[in-house]
Amino acid sequence: MEKTEWSDLPEELLDLIANRYSSNIDVLRIRSTCKSWRSAVAMSKERLQFRFERYLPTSNKKIKAHLSPTTFFRITLPSSCPNKGWLVRTRQASKMYRKITLLCPLSGERITRSHQTLDLLKVGVSEIRQSYEIQIFDGLKDEKIPLDSEIFSNYIKNSDKIPSVNYHDNKIWCCKTREGSRSWTKIKNQVEDFSDIILHMGRIYAVDLKGAIWWISLSQLTIVQQTSSTPLDYYKYDSCQDTRLVEYCGDLCIVHELSITRNHIQRTVGFKVYKMDEDLAKWVEVSCLGDNTLIVACNSCFTVVASEYHGCLKNSIYFSYYDVKKAENIKVFKLDDGSITQRTDISSQSCFHMFSLPFLNY
Protein backbone atom coordinates (compact mmCIF):
# COMPACT_ATOMS: atom_id res chain seq x y z
CA MET A 1 0.00 0.00 0.00
CA GLU A 2 1.48 3.33 -1.06
CA LYS A 3 1.99 6.07 1.48
CA THR A 4 -0.26 9.08 0.90
CA GLU A 5 1.31 12.52 1.23
CA TRP A 6 -0.43 14.94 3.60
CA SER A 7 -0.98 17.36 0.74
CA ASP A 8 -2.79 14.66 -1.26
CA LEU A 9 -5.51 13.86 1.28
CA PRO A 10 -9.05 14.04 -0.18
CA GLU A 11 -10.84 17.35 0.30
CA GLU A 12 -13.81 15.53 1.84
CA LEU A 13 -11.55 14.07 4.55
CA LEU A 14 -9.95 17.44 5.32
CA ASP A 15 -13.36 19.08 5.57
CA LEU A 16 -14.51 16.31 7.93
CA ILE A 17 -11.42 16.80 10.12
CA ALA A 18 -11.98 20.56 10.30
CA ASN A 19 -15.61 20.06 11.31
CA ARG A 20 -14.52 17.97 14.31
CA TYR A 21 -12.68 20.88 15.89
CA SER A 22 -14.51 23.31 18.17
CA SER A 23 -11.76 25.93 18.26
CA ASN A 24 -11.33 28.49 15.50
CA ILE A 25 -7.58 28.46 16.18
CA ASP A 26 -7.43 24.76 15.24
CA VAL A 27 -9.17 25.44 11.94
CA LEU A 28 -6.77 28.28 11.17
CA ARG A 29 -3.77 26.05 11.90
CA ILE A 30 -5.14 23.32 9.61
CA ARG A 31 -5.47 25.85 6.80
CA SER A 32 -1.90 27.08 7.36
CA THR A 33 -0.37 23.60 6.87
CA CYS A 34 -0.02 23.86 3.11
CA LYS A 35 -1.62 25.45 0.05
CA SER A 36 -3.85 22.46 -0.78
CA TRP A 37 -5.19 22.29 2.77
CA ARG A 38 -5.94 26.01 2.74
CA SER A 39 -7.99 25.74 -0.45
CA ALA A 40 -9.76 22.57 0.74
CA VAL A 41 -10.87 23.89 4.14
CA ALA A 42 -13.06 26.91 3.54
CA MET A 43 -13.18 29.59 6.25
CA SER A 44 -16.94 30.06 6.09
CA LYS A 45 -19.01 32.07 8.56
CA GLU A 46 -20.80 28.89 9.58
CA ARG A 47 -17.51 27.19 10.46
CA LEU A 48 -16.21 30.19 12.39
CA GLN A 49 -19.38 30.54 14.40
CA PHE A 50 -19.86 28.63 17.61
CA ARG A 51 -21.31 25.18 16.76
CA PHE A 52 -24.13 25.27 19.26
CA GLU A 53 -27.22 27.30 20.09
CA ARG A 54 -25.85 30.66 21.11
CA TYR A 55 -28.89 32.17 22.78
CA LEU A 56 -30.03 31.37 26.31
CA PRO A 57 -33.48 31.80 27.89
CA THR A 58 -34.20 35.22 29.40
CA SER A 59 -37.19 36.65 31.25
CA ASN A 60 -36.91 39.90 29.28
CA LYS A 61 -37.89 39.53 25.62
CA LYS A 62 -36.14 42.80 24.76
CA ILE A 63 -32.69 41.36 25.42
CA LYS A 64 -30.73 38.36 24.19
CA ALA A 65 -28.34 36.30 26.31
CA HIS A 66 -25.51 35.16 24.07
CA LEU A 67 -23.22 32.25 25.03
CA SER A 68 -19.70 33.14 23.91
CA PRO A 69 -16.86 30.55 23.95
CA THR A 70 -13.30 31.49 24.87
CA THR A 71 -10.18 29.32 24.83
CA PHE A 72 -6.99 29.30 26.93
CA PHE A 73 -3.71 28.53 25.17
CA ARG A 74 -0.08 28.05 26.12
CA ILE A 75 2.19 29.91 23.69
CA THR A 76 5.89 29.08 23.27
CA LEU A 77 8.67 30.57 21.15
CA PRO A 78 11.13 28.10 19.54
CA SER A 79 13.90 30.71 19.70
CA SER A 80 13.46 31.56 23.39
CA CYS A 81 13.17 28.91 26.15
CA PRO A 82 10.88 26.46 24.26
CA ASN A 83 10.03 24.75 27.57
CA LYS A 84 8.61 27.99 28.98
CA GLY A 85 5.38 29.55 27.78
CA TRP A 86 2.86 32.35 28.17
CA LEU A 87 -0.84 32.14 28.98
CA VAL A 88 -3.22 33.67 26.44
CA ARG A 89 -6.97 33.65 25.91
CA THR A 90 -9.02 34.12 22.76
CA ARG A 91 -12.69 34.61 21.95
CA GLN A 92 -13.88 32.63 18.95
CA ALA A 93 -15.43 34.30 15.96
CA SER A 94 -19.22 34.24 15.89
CA LYS A 95 -22.18 36.23 14.65
CA MET A 96 -21.51 38.82 17.34
CA TYR A 97 -17.71 38.78 17.03
CA ARG A 98 -16.52 38.74 13.42
CA LYS A 99 -12.89 37.98 14.23
CA ILE A 100 -10.95 35.90 16.73
CA THR A 101 -10.20 38.28 19.61
CA LEU A 102 -7.28 38.29 22.04
CA LEU A 103 -8.39 38.64 25.67
CA CYS A 104 -6.72 39.24 29.00
CA PRO A 105 -6.33 35.69 30.42
CA LEU A 106 -7.83 36.34 33.86
CA SER A 107 -10.47 39.04 33.41
CA GLY A 108 -11.53 38.08 29.89
CA GLU A 109 -11.45 41.75 28.86
CA ARG A 110 -10.49 42.51 25.28
CA ILE A 111 -6.92 43.65 24.70
CA THR A 112 -7.41 47.25 23.61
CA ARG A 113 -4.45 47.33 21.21
CA SER A 114 -6.56 46.08 18.30
CA HIS A 115 -3.70 46.57 15.82
CA GLN A 116 -1.73 43.76 17.45
CA THR A 117 -1.87 40.29 15.89
CA LEU A 118 -0.61 36.82 16.74
CA ASP A 119 1.28 34.99 13.97
CA LEU A 120 0.54 31.28 14.53
CA LEU A 121 3.32 30.25 12.16
CA LYS A 122 5.98 31.71 14.47
CA VAL A 123 4.84 30.30 17.81
CA GLY A 124 3.96 26.97 19.38
CA VAL A 125 0.30 26.72 20.42
CA SER A 126 -1.26 24.15 22.75
CA GLU A 127 -4.86 24.36 23.95
CA ILE A 128 -5.43 24.19 27.71
CA ARG A 129 -9.20 24.39 28.04
CA GLN A 130 -12.33 26.19 26.90
CA SER A 131 -14.51 28.51 28.91
CA TYR A 132 -17.80 30.28 28.26
CA GLU A 133 -19.28 33.62 29.20
CA ILE A 134 -22.67 35.25 28.82
CA GLN A 135 -22.97 38.48 26.85
CA ILE A 136 -26.18 40.53 26.99
CA PHE A 137 -27.39 42.18 23.77
CA ASP A 138 -30.26 44.40 22.71
CA GLY A 139 -32.77 42.02 21.11
CA LEU A 140 -33.60 44.46 18.32
CA LYS A 141 -30.23 46.03 17.53
CA ASP A 142 -27.92 43.11 18.40
CA GLU A 143 -25.75 45.60 20.28
CA LYS A 144 -23.99 44.69 23.50
CA ILE A 145 -25.60 46.18 26.61
CA PRO A 146 -23.23 47.42 29.35
CA LEU A 147 -23.93 45.83 32.73
CA ASP A 148 -23.53 47.27 36.21
CA SER A 149 -22.88 43.82 37.67
CA GLU A 150 -21.05 40.76 36.40
CA ILE A 151 -23.00 37.88 34.92
CA PHE A 152 -21.09 34.66 35.38
CA SER A 153 -21.58 31.53 33.33
CA ASN A 154 -19.99 28.15 33.13
CA TYR A 155 -20.88 25.69 30.43
CA ILE A 156 -20.24 22.00 29.75
CA LYS A 157 -20.48 20.39 26.32
CA ASN A 158 -18.93 17.03 25.48
CA SER A 159 -20.22 16.52 21.95
CA ASP A 160 -23.25 17.11 19.78
CA LYS A 161 -24.77 13.86 21.10
CA ILE A 162 -24.36 14.54 24.82
CA PRO A 163 -26.58 16.88 26.85
CA SER A 164 -25.08 20.30 27.51
CA VAL A 165 -25.35 22.07 30.83
CA ASN A 166 -25.21 25.79 31.50
CA TYR A 167 -24.96 27.66 34.78
CA HIS A 168 -26.67 31.05 34.51
CA ASP A 169 -28.07 33.42 37.13
CA ASN A 170 -27.21 30.96 39.95
CA LYS A 171 -29.39 28.26 38.36
CA ILE A 172 -28.57 25.28 36.12
CA TRP A 173 -30.06 24.60 32.68
CA CYS A 174 -29.73 21.63 30.34
CA CYS A 175 -30.07 21.21 26.58
CA LYS A 176 -30.37 17.67 25.12
CA THR A 177 -29.05 18.14 21.60
CA ARG A 178 -29.31 14.49 20.60
CA GLU A 179 -33.09 14.72 20.73
CA GLY A 180 -33.00 17.29 17.96
CA SER A 181 -34.09 20.08 20.29
CA ARG A 182 -32.09 23.19 21.09
CA SER A 183 -34.36 24.50 23.84
CA TRP A 184 -33.05 24.90 27.38
CA THR A 185 -34.72 23.22 30.37
CA LYS A 186 -34.09 24.19 33.98
CA ILE A 187 -32.86 21.33 36.21
CA LYS A 188 -35.58 20.32 38.69
CA ASN A 189 -35.58 20.60 42.51
CA GLN A 190 -32.88 23.29 42.75
CA VAL A 191 -33.32 24.27 46.40
CA GLU A 192 -30.02 26.18 46.52
CA ASP A 193 -28.29 28.80 44.41
CA PHE A 194 -25.12 27.63 42.68
CA SER A 195 -21.80 29.26 41.89
CA ASP A 196 -20.05 26.79 39.55
CA ILE A 197 -20.38 23.51 37.63
CA ILE A 198 -17.75 21.05 36.39
CA LEU A 199 -17.40 17.80 34.41
CA HIS A 200 -15.43 15.38 36.62
CA MET A 201 -14.85 11.66 35.93
CA GLY A 202 -17.68 11.63 33.39
CA ARG A 203 -20.23 13.16 35.77
CA ILE A 204 -21.44 16.74 36.14
CA TYR A 205 -21.22 18.37 39.55
CA ALA A 206 -22.26 21.76 40.91
CA VAL A 207 -21.27 23.63 44.05
CA ASP A 208 -23.74 25.80 45.95
CA LEU A 209 -23.01 29.06 47.74
CA LYS A 210 -22.48 27.17 51.03
CA GLY A 211 -19.75 24.93 49.60
CA ALA A 212 -21.77 21.70 49.21
CA ILE A 213 -21.35 19.59 46.06
CA TRP A 214 -24.36 18.33 44.08
CA TRP A 215 -24.58 15.72 41.32
CA ILE A 216 -26.65 16.51 38.23
CA SER A 217 -28.65 13.61 36.76
CA LEU A 218 -29.03 14.34 33.06
CA SER A 219 -31.43 11.45 32.50
CA GLN A 220 -33.88 12.71 35.12
CA LEU A 221 -32.96 16.42 34.89
CA THR A 222 -32.66 16.52 38.68
CA ILE A 223 -29.92 17.39 41.14
CA VAL A 224 -28.87 15.47 44.27
CA GLN A 225 -26.64 16.65 47.12
CA GLN A 226 -23.44 14.58 47.37
CA THR A 227 -21.46 16.21 50.19
CA SER A 228 -21.95 18.47 53.17
CA SER A 229 -20.81 22.09 53.12
CA THR A 230 -17.12 22.87 53.59
CA PRO A 231 -16.12 23.79 57.19
CA LEU A 232 -15.31 27.41 56.44
CA ASP A 233 -14.72 29.68 59.43
CA TYR A 234 -15.35 33.35 58.66
CA TYR A 235 -13.99 34.89 61.85
CA LYS A 236 -11.05 36.45 59.94
CA TYR A 237 -13.12 37.46 56.92
CA ASP A 238 -16.28 39.36 56.10
CA SER A 239 -17.52 37.01 53.40
CA CYS A 240 -16.76 34.35 50.83
CA GLN A 241 -16.66 36.39 47.64
CA ASP A 242 -16.69 33.44 45.25
CA THR A 243 -16.72 29.62 45.25
CA ARG A 244 -15.31 27.54 42.39
CA LEU A 245 -14.78 23.89 41.46
CA VAL A 246 -11.45 22.63 40.14
CA GLU A 247 -9.74 19.31 39.41
CA TYR A 248 -6.40 18.82 41.16
CA CYS A 249 -4.41 15.57 40.95
CA GLY A 250 -7.59 13.67 40.07
CA ASP A 251 -9.54 15.05 43.03
CA LEU A 252 -12.54 17.36 42.88
CA CYS A 253 -11.72 20.43 44.96
CA ILE A 254 -13.57 23.52 46.15
CA VAL A 255 -11.90 26.93 46.04
CA HIS A 256 -13.18 29.73 48.28
CA GLU A 257 -12.16 33.33 47.55
CA LEU A 258 -12.28 35.22 50.87
CA SER A 259 -12.68 38.96 51.26
CA ILE A 260 -13.05 41.83 53.69
CA THR A 261 -14.88 45.13 53.19
CA ARG A 262 -13.40 48.46 54.28
CA ASN A 263 -14.93 51.84 53.43
CA HIS A 264 -17.49 50.09 51.20
CA ILE A 265 -14.69 48.54 49.12
CA GLN A 266 -14.47 44.74 48.93
CA ARG A 267 -10.96 43.31 48.78
CA THR A 268 -9.76 39.71 48.34
CA VAL A 269 -7.46 38.74 51.22
CA GLY A 270 -6.99 35.01 50.71
CA PHE A 271 -8.14 31.63 49.41
CA LYS A 272 -9.07 28.29 50.95
CA VAL A 273 -8.90 25.05 48.95
CA TYR A 274 -10.67 21.88 50.15
CA LYS A 275 -10.90 18.30 48.90
CA MET A 276 -13.03 15.42 50.12
CA ASP A 277 -11.17 12.72 52.07
CA GLU A 278 -13.02 9.58 50.95
CA ASP A 279 -11.72 7.46 53.85
CA LEU A 280 -12.66 9.97 56.55
CA ALA A 281 -15.73 11.16 54.65
CA LYS A 282 -14.99 14.79 55.44
CA TRP A 283 -13.49 17.90 53.88
CA VAL A 284 -9.76 18.49 54.40
CA GLU A 285 -7.88 21.68 53.54
CA VAL A 286 -5.33 21.55 50.72
CA SER A 287 -2.37 23.53 52.08
CA CYS A 288 0.09 22.73 49.28
CA LEU A 289 -0.30 22.48 45.51
CA GLY A 290 3.22 21.17 44.99
CA ASP A 291 4.65 22.26 41.63
CA ASN A 292 1.22 23.36 40.41
CA THR A 293 -0.40 26.77 40.22
CA LEU A 294 -4.10 27.57 40.37
CA ILE A 295 -5.50 30.03 37.83
CA VAL A 296 -8.74 31.69 38.98
CA ALA A 297 -10.04 33.45 35.88
CA CYS A 298 -13.39 34.91 34.96
CA ASN A 299 -15.65 31.94 34.08
CA SER A 300 -12.88 29.37 34.55
CA CYS A 301 -10.68 27.80 37.22
CA PHE A 302 -7.86 25.34 36.47
CA THR A 303 -4.32 24.29 37.41
CA VAL A 304 -1.10 24.49 35.40
CA VAL A 305 2.43 23.22 35.99
CA ALA A 306 4.35 26.28 37.18
CA SER A 307 7.66 25.28 35.56
CA GLU A 308 6.05 25.40 32.10
CA TYR A 309 5.38 29.17 32.27
CA HIS A 310 7.63 32.22 32.45
CA GLY A 311 7.94 33.49 36.04
CA CYS A 312 5.03 31.40 37.32
CA LEU A 313 5.16 30.76 41.08
CA LYS A 314 4.40 27.21 42.19
CA ASN A 315 2.01 26.53 45.08
CA SER A 316 0.24 29.82 44.36
CA ILE A 317 -3.09 31.19 43.12
CA TYR A 318 -3.29 33.88 40.42
CA PHE A 319 -6.40 36.06 40.24
CA SER A 320 -7.49 39.47 38.97
CA TYR A 321 -9.23 42.40 40.61
CA TYR A 322 -10.36 45.93 39.76
CA ASP A 323 -9.08 48.92 41.71
CA VAL A 324 -11.05 52.04 42.66
CA LYS A 325 -10.40 53.43 39.17
CA LYS A 326 -11.92 50.30 37.58
CA ALA A 327 -8.52 49.33 36.20
CA GLU A 328 -7.67 45.63 36.05
CA ASN A 329 -4.73 44.32 38.02
CA ILE A 330 -3.36 40.85 38.66
CA LYS A 331 -2.41 39.43 42.04
CA VAL A 332 -0.85 36.20 43.25
CA PHE A 333 -1.67 34.53 46.57
CA LYS A 334 1.04 32.29 48.04
CA LEU A 335 -0.30 29.29 49.92
CA ASP A 336 2.86 28.75 51.96
CA ASP A 337 2.75 32.08 53.83
CA GLY A 338 -0.66 33.55 52.92
CA SER A 339 0.86 36.69 51.37
CA ILE A 340 -0.51 38.52 48.33
CA THR A 341 1.62 40.30 45.74
CA GLN A 342 0.22 42.52 42.99
CA ARG A 343 1.51 43.14 39.51
CA THR A 344 2.11 46.84 40.14
CA ASP A 345 4.87 46.04 42.63
CA ILE A 346 8.08 46.73 40.68
CA SER A 347 10.10 44.26 42.76
CA SER A 348 7.78 41.37 41.82
CA GLN A 349 7.31 41.94 38.08
CA SER A 350 9.04 38.66 37.14
CA CYS A 351 6.35 36.43 38.67
CA PHE A 352 3.79 37.91 36.26
CA HIS A 353 5.77 37.40 33.03
CA MET A 354 3.43 34.60 31.97
CA PHE A 355 0.75 37.24 31.30
CA SER A 356 2.93 39.57 29.20
CA LEU A 357 2.80 38.95 25.45
CA PRO A 358 6.15 39.91 23.84
CA PHE A 359 5.41 37.89 20.69
CA LEU A 360 2.52 40.04 19.43
CA ASN A 361 3.06 41.78 16.09
CA TYR A 362 2.40 45.47 15.55
Swiss-Prot record:
Pfam families: Beta-prop_KIB1-4, F-box. SMART domains: FBOX. SUPFAM superfamilies: F-box domain. Residues 4-52 form the F-box domain. InterPro entries: F-box-like_dom_sf, F-box_dom, KIB1-4_b-propeller, SCF_F-box_domain. This is Putative F-box protein At3g25750. It comes from Arabidopsis thaliana (Mouse-ear cress). The lineage of its organism: Eukaryota, Viridiplantae, Streptophyta, Embryophyta, Tracheophyta.
